[in-house]
Amino acid sequence: MAIPIAQWVADARANLAHAEQVCNDANMYLTSTSEKLRRREMKVPKLIYYLDALKQQLRLLEIIRDSLVLNLNGVMEKRAALQSQLLKDVDRLHQTIDTLKNTVVVFDGQTTLYEYISESGVEELFNGVSQNLKDIQTLIKGNRTDALLIRLTSDLDHLSNELNALDSKFRDMRLVDTQSSSIDPISKLLEINAELEHDMVAILTSFNNHYDQCEKGEAILKDPAVPQDEKDELVSVLQNDVEELPEAQRSLTSNAEIIKKNCKEVMKILDIFEDYFQRVETYVCELQEYGESKLRVQLKEFSDINTEVSRKLEIAQTHQDELVQYNSDFQQFVRSYYSLILELDRRMRVNEHISSAIDNFRSTISNIVEKDHEKRMEFLQKHGDFIPQNLVDSSVINSGTPQISINFDQEPLPAISKEVVQLAKKMQK
């Protein structure tokens, strides 16, 4: 029986070439997967940095938002408190003005205290208060501070939800060293591929050895110096190898297909990572664009509103101070008016006291003068004829009673009724 050694050599060469091609194809998948995995491992630290930095940026934005809310609430609370106080002070000043209008000046009985104040200044203040409060209300409504705050909060909520989704996906991908690698699908697939690759190397080595043995066998069979029994043993070995070739080829192909399938699965997972990484980078750009454009505009709007409202509130505070001052001055005017009445009444009573005292003094003096006159007459009657004229100056002997003149010019004061005086006393309490 002829030994088909030449056919075995040809088949061995063909099988080796096919096995090499199968291994090369599988190796291409392994190399491509390894390269893509290497790129992923290089991106993981950057990804972790991105996520940490993004979380910090969002926390900073939330702090800015909360600060704006506090600032805006503070301005709005100040505005509400100041507006309430202004309205109270306006009402008080109106009441004081009504008092001025209802207080008739007793000195002429026609004019009121209101006619002695600067009406234009008061009206200008009232108009200023009213207009400034309207301006503040228009400013707040026109710029829709609530809407601005809602938009800012909505934007931050949207960004926060996106980042939370990205962070959750990151945890699901199990990329951190501290996480268990035993349940990492890529690690499991790569472990399987390593075992299959080891088997394929062994199979490819067997194909290569078989080819070498076939070539050597062909030479041995042609060599007459080799004993026949050795040739028969060699043929038996080669025959067994030839019979095992199809199964080895099937195992090699099967392993290669499994490796390709596993690599495709790994690539799919890596593609998911690449897509995720791209989403994170897109989010970074989105957050950066938001900060440089939309947030900048929103912050400027808040700043403009805050600045303008604060300026208007300063004006309102000035108005409030002026209202208090006007009210204080006008109330003091009323008190001073009634104090004037009491002062005039006091002076009138002083005049009366002085007049009464002078009348009493005149009566006393009159009695003294009258008694003095009687004494003089009595003296002259008894002694006048016996005193020489040159004993003392005759004018002394014959002088008359001293004359005393008392004049009192009363202070001209307007007449004030007792009812008005009583009212003045009541108003001073």
UniProtKB/Swiss-Prot annotation:
Cite the InterPro entries for this sequence.
Answer: Atg17 (IPR007240), ATG17-like_dom (IPR045326)
Give an example GO cellular component term for this record: Atg1/ULK1 kinase complex
Q: Which UniProt keywords apply?
A: Autophagy, Coiled coil, Cytoplasm, Membrane
What superkingdom heads the lineage? Eukaryota
Membrane topology of the entry = Peripheral membrane protein
Among the Pfam families in the record, one is ATG17_like
Assign the protein's first listed, main location to one coarse class: cytoplasm
Q: Give the location in the cell.
A: Cytoplasm; Preautophagosomal structure membrane
The Swiss-Prot or TrEMBL record annotates one GO molecular function as: protein kinase activator activity
Entry's Gene Ontology BP terms = autophagosome assembly; autophagy of mitochondrion; piecemeal microautophagy of the nucleus
As given in the record, the signal peptide range reads: none
Which regions form coiled coils?
Answer: 146-175
Query: Which family is it part of?
Result: Belongs to the ATG17 family.
Q: What does this protein do?
A: Autophagy-specific protein that functions in response to autophagy-inducing signals as a scaffold to recruit other ATG proteins to organize pre-autophagosomal structure (PAS) formation. Modulates the timing and magnitude of the autophagy response, such as the size of the sequestering vesicles. Plays particularly a role in pexophagy and nucleophagy.
Q: What is this protein called?
A: Autophagy-related protein 17
* Chain's gene name: ATG17
